[in-house]
Each structure stands twice: as C-alpha cells, then as structure tokens.
Amino acid sequence: MRGVRGKRISMIMQDPKYSLNPVVCVGKQIAEAWLTHHPGRKDEAKARALEMLEVVRIRQPERVYQLYPHEISGGQGQRIMIAMMLITDPELIIADEPTSALDVSVRLQVLGLLDDLVQSRGLGLIFISHDINLVRSFCDRVLVMYAGRVVESIAAKDLDHARHPYTQGLINSLPDMQHRRPILPVLQRQASWLTD
C-alpha cells in the first residue's frame, strides 16, 4: 500500500494549519515524505526538499526550510503542502479543497501553480471542491457527487447543460449579478437520486 500511497498518488489537504506538524520545521516535514520512500538518504532528502520549495515558487527556500508552520502565511503553507506531495514524483495528485482557506489573489496563484505542475510534469489531478464556478474555470471534466455517489459526469464547459437535477440545482442556486433574484432557489432533494 505504501508503494502506491505517497509514491504514485499524493494528496494535498484542505488547510495546512491542520495538516502540518506544529513542532517540526516545514523543510523537515517535506524531507520526511522523501525519506518514507527512500530510507537512509537524509542529505539527498534535504536537497530534494529545497528543490521542491523552489519548484513551488517559495522565495528564499533555505530560510523557509527552517521555519515552523506558525511562521508562514496561508499561501506559503499551501505551497509547502504541494511541495510535500510533489517530492515523491507522484503520477496523480488529489487536491481536497486546496484553496478554500486562501484569499482570492493567493488562490489564483496556487491554482496557477497547480496548473503549471500538471502541464509540465504530466500529472493527473483530481480536484475536489464545492465551488462550482472554480471547478468550471479550472477543471476539464467534472464528476458531481451526491450522498457519496457519482450522479453525473460532464465536461466542465458543458455544466450549463447538466442533466441531473442535483447538478442543475447547484448551478441554479449560485447568485447571478446580472439577473438579480429576490430569493435564491432552494434545492429540492429527491430520494430517487440515491437509487437511479
């Protein structure tokens, strides 16, 4: 299992504040991911960790390597989480709401970084989000889940033509600045969605 988890598939968690160990400097945490799959190669682990900090566009990687999680910003923390996941050269990254704790400008930087890494390294990316507009602009294909089941698979560019009532309800509940509505529609859930 360890040969797949972390090595071939890595996961970027939602909020680095809760994912990083508060009593270990961030560089050592990145290096630890490398050492899990390459035991006994500590010097190489530190060099790889510094390289990954550069890959995720962290300025002054040697300085940041020594910092603790409380000493870094939210955007830096998310980049550090990405570096930790990239250090093992995975084939697939699962990103669970990786930008939900970030402000809009930092969110765009992190999304740009993820997109560049996917393109340059040929990675697969599963991007988990509740933000329909973000998914529409960032993803190629969308799997819509309801109660733990996939209810619709659709190209992101075709979301406006979704067929499943749950997907339609999610889209219709989004505020629209062009067409003001006094009340946003409420999604009417149906038991048949669990059996279809």
Task: Describe the role of every protein-language-model region.
Residues 108-121, 133:
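Helical segment within the ABC ATPase nucleotide-binding domain
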Residues 135-137:
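A short, surface-exposed alpha-helical micro-motif characterized by mixed small hydrophobic
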